Amino acid sequence: MRQTPLWAENWPIAYSVIQAIVILLVVVLVAALMSFIERRLLAWWQDRYGPNRVGPGGMFQIVADMLKIMFKEDWTPKFADKLTFRMAPAVAMATAVLSFIVIPVSPTLGVADMSIGLLFFMAMAGIAVYAVLFGGWASNNKYSLLGGLRSAAQTISYEVFLGISLMGVVAIAGSFNLREIVEAQRDMWFIVPQFLGFMIFVVAGVAVTHRHPFDQPEAEQELAEGYHVEYGGMKWGMFFVAEYVNIVLISALIVTLFFGGWLAPFNLEIPFIPPVFWFIVKTAFFVMMFVLARGALMRPRYDQVMNFGWKVCLPLALVNLMVTGAVILMNQA
C-alpha cells in the first residue's frame, strides 16, 4: 500500500509538483552525466584514455560540453521548414521526460500513480516517432530524410514487439499500474516466469532508443548522423539528452517490470537501506549494459534488423503471450 507523508495528504498537488520537479531534474542531470560515463567506460573497456583534461580525472568534461553546446550558434537551414524544424527536438525531449512520470522509484516516491501507466508509456513512445520524422523531413536534406524514414519504420515495428512482450507481465500482475506490478513481484520477480518476454523487451527497447547495434537511423558511416545532421547547438543538445533519457527510461522499466523495482533481492528486509537504493542500483546496471552493447557488438544491416524483428521477435512475443495466458487459465481452473 502506498504511504505518503502526513503533510502530503493535506497538500496533494504541491506534493506531486515537488516529486515531479525532483525526479525530472535528477533524470535530466543523470542523462547529461551519462555522456561522460559512457566515454569513460568505453575507454576503460578498450584500454585507452577517455576524457581526462577538464578537471581531476576529466570529471568536469560534461560541464565543458554543456557550455559549448549552449554557446553554439542556433542555426536553421535556409530551405528548412522552420516551425517543424524547431518543433522536432522539443517533441523528442518532452516525450522522453513525460514518460518518467509513471515510473515508481519507491513505495512513496513517484510523480503519478496511473492505473494505465504502461499504456501511457506506449503512447509517449508512439508520439516520439514524430520527433524524428519532423526532424528528418523539415531539414530538407536527403540524409536527414533517409534517417527519419529508417527511424520511423524501425521504431514503429519494434514498438509492436515491445508492447506484446509487456502483455505477459500485465496478465500475471492483472494491472497496467506499474506500482501494482512491482507489488505483485514480492514472492517472485517476473524475470523467472517471463524470461522470454524480458529478452524481447530488451531487444525492442534498444531498437526503440536507436542505440547500438540498432542505431541505423543515425549511422555515422552511412547517413552522416541521420535525421539530426542539420541540427546544432541547443536543438542538437535536446536530441542528445533525450536519447540518454530514453536509455535511463528503458532501464528503469526493465527493473520495474522484471526485477522487482524497489524490492530487495530475495525479499530481504534491511532497515538501513531505503527501497530507492535498490531501484537505483538495478537501473544503473542496465544502463551500463547499454554502454557495453555499444562497445562489444557490431551493427547489422538495416534489412537484417527489420527481418529479425518481424521474423523472430514477433513470433516469440506471440508465443510468450499465448503460453502465459494458457498457464494462467489452467491455474484458475
From Swiss-Prot:
KW NAD (keyword) present: yes
Gene Ontology biological-process annotations: aerobic respiration
Keywords linked to the UniProt accession: Cell inner membrane, Cell membrane, Membrane, NAD, Quinone, Translocase, Transmembrane, Transmembrane helix, Ubiquinone
InterPro entries: NADH_UbQ_OxRdtase_su1/FPO, NADH_UbQ_OxRdtase_su1_CS
Catalytic activity: a quinone + NADH + 5 H(+)(in) = a quinol + NAD(+) + 4 H(+)(out)
Chief location category: membrane
GO CC annotations on file: plasma membrane
A molecular-function term among this protein's GO annotations: quinone binding
Function: NDH-1 shuttles electrons from NADH, via FMN and iron-sulfur (Fe-S) centers, to quinones in the respiratory chain. The immediate electron acceptor for the enzyme in this species is believed to be ubiquinone. Couples the redox reaction to proton translocation (for every two electrons transferred, four hydrogen ions are translocated across the cytoplasmic membrane), and thus conserves the redox energy in a proton gradient. This subunit may bind ubiquinone.
Family affiliation: Belongs to the complex I subunit 1 family.
Protein name per UniProt: NADH-quinone oxidoreductase subunit H
Native organism taxonomy: Bacteria, Pseudomonadati, Pseudomonadota, Gammaproteobacteria, Moraxellales
